[in-house]
Amino acid sequence: MAIVLDGNSLTIEKLEAIARHGEKVELDKDALERIKVCRAMLEEKIQAREIMYGVNTGIGEFSEVVLTDEQVKDFQKYLIYNHAAGIGDPAPVEYVRGAMAGRINVHARGHSGCRPEITLTLVEMLNKGVTPVVCQKGSVGACGDLAPMAQMALCMMGEGESFYQGKRMPTREAMAEAGIAIPGLQARDGLATINGSNLLTAMSALHLYDIDSWLKQAEIACAMSLEALMANLKPYDVRLHQLRGFPGAVRSSRAIMKCIEGSDLLSGKMKTKVQDAYSMRSSPQVIGAAHDAVAWAKAQVETELNGVGDNPVFLPEDKLTLTGANFQGSPVSLPMDMVGAAVTMVSVMSERRMNRLNNPALSVGLPAFLTKGAGMFSGLMLSQYTADSLIVEQRILSMPASIQSIPAAADQEDFVSMGMNTAIKNGQILDNAYGVLGIEFMAAAQALDFRDFKPGKGVQTAHKIIRKYVEFLDVDRPLYPDHTRMKELVKSGEILEEVEDVVGPLG
């Protein structure tokens, strides 16, 4: 069944299904009527020669320039030509499909003033698999993602390039092969297609979807390391975290203990320390803080997905045009900067647990670097180097982009969100985080093979999955294939899926 876009109910999960899995979309009937009513009001105002930003005026610094009737006809075309000014490699198809769905949902609110044909063409392109080729770099996150969205708007004129059936081709050819009519651009249509933070918001939504899975796997990896290090398990008692009251920590402690359930460590017969190091016993607080950051970001992103991110906006019921800055990406870029830092923070803690597994002074009886032949063999010594390299890069990328505004457009646009930079770097942070967590998983599995007690059911399951892809390190071998396989394993979510089948949902 198609996902209905009505301007009010687009979730991160629905957007992920549209962007990645080709779910069909349908424009809500009431939404289509709202679009028609808004357009009719706009055309009345055009006939009455009411001055409206971006309709019969220039844009940015030229907003005080009033266009003639003849200029209005061609203005949208030249606006899009001028704004299609990005650079670099094309954004992944899933990001662009997400942005298209987001823009349709903005129009569905009935305040953008474009012709219905524009919105319906975007719907048809999504459903038939025509995806604009969009340079990922060039947006400053206000007025929205102008440069990349302008490449989407080129398609409304049959210009630019698109991906169709796995091939990159001129948009006019793609539209013809898919049987999609080219609507052209009339007054307001171009600006109504580009003037919002839809690409950075779609990217952020997909990152949040993936980070939720990654954080759950961080809890599984943590549980494995805790067992391998023979941790005192009192710090993971959910009652401790309920007393403080942070929902993320409560959730995280519960997830960790689910993975450890059934372990010999819970019998009370094994000797453990009175208190372990912070990288062990404060794991629920740290991973939990990341969960709480993600929860805030998710609320912000879903508000943006269902909000009127546009300028100007039109209120048909009041016969009113309002100009403002609803394109400003800060409500998304600020929480997403925090999410990027949160992923890096959890990665740092993952590496610290791996360090304890490797270090014979800290590992409670494990061999140095988790190898049987210390001296002749170096075990997982260099795996830690790799994790450290990734984390340094994550730390650099965790500098907030939302505070990096550079004034532009003759200082008319003198504060911008830089939200696209946030979105791009968060993708890089998460990619590194898959590698860091994969290395902790590999080290924890190696360490558990040196222990002679029974771990928890969730930990046993994770260990079994890891051993499908990476063998026990008996003697030294090149480890880069193992690191790569572990990174891809974490990215796939297979460990999480199998563990949840055994212990129940970790969310």
Per-region residue spans from a language model:
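Glycine-rich, flexible loop motifs
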Residues: 2-13, 19-49, 79-134, 226
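C-terminal auxiliary extensions adjacent to catalytic cores
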Residues: 2-23, 27-34, 38-46, 155-507
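Generic structural signal for well-ordered secondary structure
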Residues: 35, 52-55, 68, 72-73, ...
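Polyanion/phosphate-binding surface patch
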Residues: 50, 65, 252
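FAD-binding core of FAD-dependent oxidoreductases
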Residues: 53-75, 83-105, 133-157, 173, ...
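Short gly/ser-rich anion-binding loops that grip negatively charged ligand groups
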Residues: 65, 85-89, 108-112, 287, ...
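Catalytic or ion-translocation cores adjacent to nucleophile or general acid/base/metal-coordination motifs
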Residues: 69-84, 356-368
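Short, well-structured alpha-helical patches and their helix-loop capping segments
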Residues: 107-114, 137-140, 144-145, 203-206, ...
